[in-house]
Amino acid sequence: MRIVRLILSAALGISALVGIQILATDYWIWSAALTHAYGLMAFVGLDLALIFAVWRVTRVAVFGALLTATFQLVAMLGDIVGGQPAGLPASVFRNYLLADTAYVGLLFTQGLIMAITVGTWALPHLHGHWPGALRIVRH
């Protein structure tokens, strides 16, 4: 479980650092989408809190990380689909977001956190029930 804690803490730390970098360098989020900036601040705070929680109450923190990453991923995908500021064409805003490497990196990191947390929950339950293609045969 220690390895899972380290990997999950690293992923949450990367998520928090990328979020901080976006907040520090993205002028558009502060000028055109202030509520998005506040939401990102909340997600950064949750990521930082979950880093410490993973080492104290692992099961609750893993579930919290899954929920936080899921909500953040859905919110970010919602921004891509229809979260453009007033007066700006959706395609322009979508291209702006998808050209921003920090945004795409944060989006990818949320998927990674979700995969880690689901894997942490699922692996103990799969013991002895691996699909045939994944089963290691020992003679």
Specify the residue positions occupied by each region the protein language model found.
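Topology signature of small-to-medium multi-pass alpha-helical membrane proteins
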Residues: 1-139
